[in-house]
UniProtKB/Swiss-Prot annotation:
Other facts: Probably starts on Met-1; overexpressed protein starting at Met-19 has lower activity, forms aggregates during reaction and is unstable in storage at -80 degrees Celsius.
One Pfam family matching this protein: AMP-binding_C
Protein's UniProt name: Medium-chain fatty-acid--CoA ligase
One cellular component term from this protein's GO annotations in UniProt: plasma membrane
Phenotype upon gene inactivation: Cells lacking this gene grow normally on aerobic oleate plates, but grow relatively poorly on oleate plus nitrate plates under anaerobic conditions. The double fadD fadK deletion mutant fails to grow on fatty acids under either aerobic or anaerobic conditions, although fadD mutants grow on fatty acids under anaerobic conditions.
Pathway: Lipid metabolism; fatty acid beta-oxidation
Species this chain originates from: Escherichia coli (strain K12)
The gene coding this protein: fadK
Top EC group: ligase
Amino acid sequence: MHPTGPHLGPDVLFRESNMKVTLTFNEQRRAAYRQQGLWGDASLADYWQQTARAMPDKIAVVDNHGASYTYSALDHAASCLANWMLAKGIESGDRIAFQLPGWCEFTVIYLACLKIGAVSVPLLPSWREAELVWVLNKCQAKMFFAPTLFKQTRPVDLILPLQNQLPQLQQIVGVDKLAPATSSLSLSQIIADNTSLTTAITTHGDELAAVLFTSGTEGLPKGVMLTHNNILASERAYCARLNLTWQDVFMMPAPLGHATGFLHGVTAPFLIGARSVLLDIFTPDACLALLEQQRCTCMLGATPFVYDLLNVLEKQPADLSALRFFLCGGTTIPKKVARECQQRGIKLLSVYGSTESSPHAVVNLDDPLSRFMHTDGYAAAGVEIKVVDDARKTLPPGCEGEEASRGPNVFMGYFDEPELTARALDEEGWYYSGDLCRMDEAGYIKITGRKKDIIVRGGENISSREVEDILLQHPKIHDACVVAMSDERLGERSCAYVVLKAPHHSLSLEEVVAFFSRKRVAKYKYPEHIVVIEKLPRTTSGKIQKFLLRKDIMRRLTQDVCEEIE
C-alpha cells in the first residue's frame, strides 16, 4: 500500500469549541503512515527532550547578538517559561503568538509551547498593526510575545493600544533583548522568577503543533495547520536527503516566521542535535561573519541571499571551507548565480516546497550540476508528486501543468477556512500548489510559473489582491491592478497599474507609499512601481487581462519609463 496524505476535503471536520481545534484523519492513510514509520505517537517535545538529555553541554543555538545556549540551558529557560504559562492558565491546544526576528529567544518560546502542548504561531517581524490584529483574532491567540526594541521601533508597543480589538488576548510579553520592558511584562524577568516545569504534559503526534500564516491569492494571510507528525515527517526526510547530522551547523538568515526559518532553521537542528545559527537582519557582511565565525556547514535561503553574498565575496574574500552547501528555494535560481557559485566552490542546491507541503522536492547531494541548475529536485521520502491539467487529471512527463503533492508532511488545512481548505486539498489528500511545473522521466520537477496570483519578492509571498484592495481605498484611485515585474536580485517586485478618479490626472509613487504607511501594513507589500493608465484591459466578461499588463511592464522596464522607489 503506497502512503498517502490525510483525508482533507469538503467533508473535513474542522470546528472550534471552547477555543479548541478538532482535526479528523482518514484512518486508512493514517494507519499506512504509522505502519511505514512516517507517523507515530511521539511529539516534537519528546524529540527535544531526547536530544537535550543526550547532549546537554552541546551548543544548541546562537545569534548575531552574541547570545548562546547549550541544550541544557535552553531546556531550562523554556521549562521556566512553560511553568509560567501553565500558571497563567494556558492549556494544551491554546495558541501562542510570537513576533520575533532571528534571536535565541524565539527558540525558548517555541520550546515552552511544545512542553505544554500549546500551539506555536510564529509571525513575521515585518508585520504591522493591520496584519497583527487580523492574525491574532483569527487564531484567537491567548499570549503574544514581541521585542521591546527592533529596527529602531518598539514592536510590543504597537499591540498594546489595540487590546480592545483583541478580546481573546490575555498576556502581552516584551522580549527585552535590546531594551528594557517599560509597558509590558518582560521575558527575562519571567524566566528568572520561575522554576523549571515539574508537571509532565503528554502531547500526541497527531495534535496540532503550529499554525504558520502565509500570504496567498485570497488576500489576508491564511493559517496553515501542521501537526507534530507533519513537522517530524517533513524535517526527518529533509535531513535524510541532505545527510544532515549532529555535527552540522545550520545558518538561517531567513525570517523564523516563515516555514523556511521555523522548520529548517529551528526545528530540524534540534531533532538531530545540531547547532542553529540565527541572524536577525540580513546583510551580506553580517552573514559572512557568522558563516566564518561559527564554521557553518549549511545555509538555506532565497536567491537574494546568494546574490548579495556573491557580490560581497567579489571584493572581500571569506573562508567558507566549512560550508557543505547552500540550499536555495522560493524562486528560480538564475544561471549566472549558479555559475558563480560553481566557480567559487559553493555547492548550490535547489529545493521546492511550500508552507502547506514543506519541503517535498529536493535534489541529491551527489546529483550532477545539470540537476542543480535545471530542476527543483524530486520527491522526498514518503511524498508523491504529480503534474495535473485544469481538470486535475495526471499529465505525462514533459507536459506543463499544476504541481500537486501528498504525503505525511502535507498540512491539515487552513485554520478556520473550510472552503479554502476544500479548494486546496482533495478527498484523496492531494495538495494543489497553484504552481506550474514539468516532471521528467526520472521524477525530477522544474517549477515554470504560477497559476495563483502572487508576487514572490525575495522569498516573501505578496498577494496581488491584498495590495489591490488597499490601492482601491486611495481617494484618487478608481481602478487598480497589481502584477509582478522581474528583478535581478529579488526575483520579482510589484508594479501597480492604476486608473484615477476625475478630476485627478497624476499620482506619484511617494503618495502611494505614504498611503500604505498610514494603513499600517508591512513595508514589503508596498507597490514599488506605479503606472497611471486610462483604463485596465479587460475581457468581455470584465476580467482584467493581467498577461497584457505583464507584457507592458516588461516593455516599460526596457525603456526605463517607470517611476521606481529607491
